[in-house]
């Protein structure tokens, strides 16, 4: 399908779900600055290949918001797609919520995996003020099947303590102390750099970064990494077992959170995606939004070895 055909297919699916608009951000479920091609949904639906942009599709319009760094590129790549460029660096350019409140009605769909908790809640509040309803629906994945790049499966490997200067056990002890101070028994981590730092692991899932696509849930008596089994060879299994890390499949993080037992849970609302938040066991009513996360705070203070 070309871009025009994809837009037609998306609008058909929107109609089926009873939504009047769909927002497709240029992000991934981990709020990464650089992401794997599997999640380049904004580019797939618009044809724009720049690193920063957000698409909005209604039943009769398609628009792309991007900043002034990409105006020339967007003008060239959007030709023939029916997608209109919205120059968000220009002073008279409306924000996406402003435009939606002025030009559509009813409900707006977003994939909750592509929005942080904070971003989702802020968008929801603004849209509701304008009389619109925000719905959590993934409308791109059902359409983008053929030719979609797989989630990368580079091998997980240990980043040795002689380079990190601190053991996983020590880092987890400090994290659990921060959890205790907030009266929480669980912490959800989705930022890939934080996971790599906490568990002393690395990967090659994203070009030019040593990241490994995964989630982590830290509890008071265990720590679980959610990662594709294809990323784990014998050495990786041995390392994770040695440092006491439990292993679950990447997609199992949602069902794990649904049955998680804790009185309180911590998360960084600027990084953790809305789908993870929505999956948390509803019995856990104490939900502490910390930004930045305790892991990022610790990561930012370098020890002598790292210096």
Predicted feature descriptions by range:
Residues 1-307:
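Terminal domain-start leader segments
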